[in-house]
């Protein structure tokens, strides 16, 4: 069986994807698999044909690598792949769609509004309808790219303009003061969680991928009942989108202990600072064991 590790891509998360892909490639190599590294570009389909892979291990972050497009291409080609399917990938990447599904399933999310670029440009939206502080983010980006916490109208306008660089819709969320906790899910099990405490600001792109900028509390220092509730909520969010394989569910717990789900990441980072490998260690998985389990889950799903 020949495994193709597909990473890189052309999204704003390319560099992180390459680092994740290299780590996965090295692990599969050490596990004895016949493996090839494929840097995804517009010629991805041709590269896959040339390499004649039997299964794709997807480590693409953002853009068409995580929004269902590559997954759909692989299905047309008849090649199984790791992680979530076309629809689940598309829904998870679209923050507006996923939030509405979470609400339908009784999963709490921060109060939010959606701002369309055409309405904003035409001044059809009154900024006075938004209260501060709030979180402004692109509707379809990951790794906290284009995300800002804003405290006044001037910051709001700058944040909106930045977020619109990444798409035609922007999510504006109520800012929840609290603890940021991430739950790892593998297959149909919640592995555990980690609390992240950025040393400055919020858990930004820089804080996520730069050593020393974030403190990781593993497992979170919370009472056991709340921890179990968060794990149940993480698994419920994963299942509500019909996700497969390994995912990471991001949450905020407010000062009263109320949890809010922010998003589900269908292809979490697999770098040395990434959260899913840290969380998986709580369930007894080292990095190679996690990679092997993700691959084996996709093979089992493909057999069904």
Swiss-Prot record:
Superkingdom: Bacteria
EC numbers: 6.3.2.4
Cofactor list: Mg(2+); Mn(2+)
Residues reported in the UniProt entry to bind Mg(2+) 1: 250, 263
Keyword Phosphoprotein applies: no
UniProt pathway annotation: Cell wall biogenesis; peptidoglycan biosynthesis
Single GO MF descriptor: ATP binding
Cofactor descriptive note: Binds 2 magnesium or manganese ions per subunit.
A Pfam family annotated for this UniProt entry: Dala_Dala_lig_C
Enzyme class, UniProt record, top EC level: ligase
Similarity-based family: Belongs to the D-alanine--D-alanine ligase family.
Primary role: Cell wall formation.
HAMAP family noted in UniProt: Dala_Dala_lig
Name of the protein described by the UniProt record: D-alanine--D-alanine ligase
Species whose genome carries this gene: Thermodesulfovibrio yellowstonii (strain ATCC 51303 / DSM 11347 / YP87)
Record gene name: ddl
